[in-house]
Each structure stands twice: as structure tokens, then as C-alpha cells.
A protein has these predicted regions:
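Active-site-proximal alpha-helix that buttresses catalytic centers in soluble enzyme cores
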Residues: 1-362
């Protein structure tokens, strides 16, 4: 079997499965990433689709393959770690389409943690020191911001990324915070970190793309920075289309294409498969999607031209509309779909209690 698609009896296609965003820049960045992947698989049909809030949907992308007579699709989730979207929502769409249309869909792994992803992360943080030669890693604390989910395995993987960067660059200290769902959130985490005594704070959003969450992180950083004028805060760029990220996508595709290694996810710490302490009630739960009613919605936010400026959240707050929290996705667009109960939803530094404190102040 050749990488250019020759010597293949049944023509196949590659589907890059994205989450989706209402932010124009995030979608453009995703498209650029897909083009980089296409460049590595010339002669093979490569399409992309989104789970929600952007077009084309995953079904739209699969329809393109069907119209071309493609009978096998290699689907790879464009997500850093395996939480609900990777384990439940995307597979639900793919399985349903496969059964209805008699198309074989082989699902690959999330990007996960490998040397390539660690190197990409280290280089993003190293760029801060290259551009600011007056500061040193040994005098700086690193704050890695993960997305946050109700899946403890996905959350813990962000901590591993933090440690690998800290040791790789020789940082003075490292902390992990999250943008939503779990704890500690960005602002309370930073309020703790500024007490450690380091004069430089490097904030690295461990995200693939731009969007409202990255903007929210910057706004919360500004809030803490105003209260700590003696400290210097620096932003590391999120991953985007870093060459090593593209390399990892190629690795995941090739795991399926050439049946190299094991393309299955690591289930040893999956809360649905293993009796994880504190998550015993979720072992064996039926893994179902709750995105069917938002899939394919593609209304872009028109409050900002390109990069999210946070106007959407400010507008929602002005209207008194509650943002998602406590086991929900935390996006600026309300999902209104059910998530399983998260044991730590009521943590003092989690979204529910912090939201309540803010409302008490107002």
C-alpha cells in the first residue's frame, strides 16, 4: 500500500474530525492545519468536518466521500486528549453514518502525548524566552492552561505536559490550571501562583486553535496582572499548525493506514472501562452522544472580525445569561445538552462555586 493512494483495491479517504467554533480565526486555523495534512497525502481525498457550530458537519464531509464512491474512511479526531467528544460524540456520528450508508469507517486515536507534541509545546514556550532575552527559565514559573473536562484521565494528561516542559526547559516552577469544567480555573490558579515569589509568569494555553477560551484566558490574566504590577506576565502561543502537530496527525493516520502499532485508545485509565477511584459509578455506562441537536449549526460570531475579542461573553453577561459551568462545556455558546455528573463539579475552585461567588458580589 502506497501513501499516494496507489496499489489500493478499495479507494479510501481521510477525515479530520474537528470540534467546531463560531470564531472565524479558529476555523481558518483548522482549515490551514487540514491543508498541511493534505500536502502529506497527495492523491488521497482528505476532508474535514466539525462536530458542532461550524460547517461542514461530519455528516457533510462523509457525504462528499460517498458521492465520490469511496467505501472506506480513516477518521482521526483533531483533539489533544480523549474525553467526551473523542470517546462518545464523534464515534456516535461515525457509527450511525457507517451503518446507514454501508461505508467502513476506521477511527483513530486522539493526538495524545508523544515526543512530537511535547517538543511542539516546549518550542512554543521557548519562543517566549527567545523574544524576551532579559528573562530566564530558571527565574520563571510556567502556567499551562488545559481545556478541562469531566474526564480525569484527560485532565491529568495536561499535568504531564506541564512537567515535561518544566524539566525540558529548566523552568523554576510549573503549575496546571484549566479553562473550564474542572479545577483550578485560570484566575484562582493565577492568584495562587503569584504568591510563589517568582517575578516572571509564562502562560501557555495548551490548545490547538484560537477562540473564545484563549481570549478568556488572556482576560483573566489581565485581571490578576492588574493586582500584581510587580510581576511580569508573558503569553506563549497555543499550538496551532506547528510542524510537530502535523507530524502527529500523520502518525495517527499512518497507525490506521499501515496498521502500525495499536491505533486504539489507551483504555487503562478510562473512567468507562477502569474502576477509577472517585469515578466508580461511571464504569460500564453507556457511551452516547448528546450533540445531535447542535451538529451542523454553522452560525459564525460576527462581533469580531477574526480573533475572538471576548465581546460575545461580555454581551451575554450584560444580558444576564448564565454561562455553562459545572460539568458543561464552558463555551460562550450555550450547549444545553446533558453531561454526566462530575464528582468534582462543586469543588471550591471549580466553575459552579466561583460563578456563585461572582453572582453574590453583583
Amino acid at each position: 500500500m502506497d501513501k499516494d493512494g496507489s496499489n489500493i483495491k478499495n479507494h479510501f479517504g481521510i477525515l479530520i474530525c474537528g470540534h467546531g467554533s463560531r470564531n472565524k480565526l479558529a476555523i481558518e486555523e483548522f482549515k490551514d492545519l487540514t491543508l498541511s495534512i493534505k500536502d502529506r497525502y497527495k492523491g488521497i481525498d482528505v476532508e474535514y468536518g466539525f462536530l458542532e457550530f461550524a460547517q461542514p458537519s461530519l455528516v457533510d464531509a462523509l457525504d462528499k466521500f460517498k458521492k465520490k464512491g469511496i467505501t472506506k474512511v480513516l477518521a482521526v479526531p483533531a483533539m489533544l486528549f480523549a474525553a467526551g467528544h473523542v470517546k462518545n460524540d464523534i464515534p456516535s456520528v461515525l457509527n450511525s453514518y457507517s451503518k446507514k450508508n454501508n461505508i467502513e469507517i476506521v477511527y483513530g486515536r486522539e493526538l495524545g502525548i508523544n515526543n512530537l507534541m511535547v517538543s511542539a509545546a516546549c518550542e512554543r514556550v521557548k519562543d517566549v524566552f527567545t523574544k524576551n532575552i532579559e528573562i530566564k527559565p530558571s527565574e520563571s514559573v510556567l502556567v499551562v492552561v488545559g481545556r478541562g473536562s469531566s474526564d480525569p484521565d484527560a485532565n491529568s494528561n495536561v499535568c504531564k505536559i506541564t512537567r515535561m516542559i518544566v524539566e525540558g526547559l529548566g523552568m523554576a516552577w510549573g503549575e496546571t490550571v484549566y479553562s473550564g469544567v474542572t479545577f483550578p480555573l485560570v484566575e484562582p490558579g493565577l492568584n495562587h501562583i503569584v504568591k510563589l515569589g517568582y517575578k516572571n509568569v509564562i502562560i501557555f494555553p495548551y490548545f490547538l486553535f484560537s477562540g473564545v477560551l484563549v481570549t478568556r484566558i488572556k482576560r483573566q490574566r489581565d485581571t490578576v496582572a492588574l493586582k500584581n504590577p510587580n510581576l511580569a506576565f508573558y503569553d506563549a502561543k497555543y499550538l496551532s499548525s506547528h510542524p510537530h502537530v502535523v507530524d502527529t496527525f500523520e502518525e495517527r493516520i499512518n497507525e490506521i493506514l499501515y496498521k502500525k502499532n495499536n491505533a486504539d485508545m489507551n483504555c487503562s485509565l478510562c473512567k468507562y472501562r477502569s474502576n477509577l477511584f472517585g469515578f466508580e459509578s461511571e464504569v460500564g455506562l453507556t457511551q452516547v452522544s448528546h450533540h445531535d441537536h447542535v451538529e451542523g449549526l454553522g452560525i459564525s460570531c460576527d462581533l469580531c472580525v477574526s480573533e475572538c475579542n471576548g465581546s460575545c461573553e461580555l454581551e451575554i453577561q450584560a444580558l444576564g445569561t448564565q454561562l455553562d459551568s459545572g460539568g458543561k462545556s464552558g463555551h460562550h455558546h450555550n450547549h444545553h445538552h446533558h453531561h454526566s455528573n462530575y464528582p468534582n463539579a462543586m469543588h471550591p475552585l471549580g466553575p459552579v462555586n466561583l460563578k456563585a461567588k461572582e453572582e453574590d458580589k453583583s
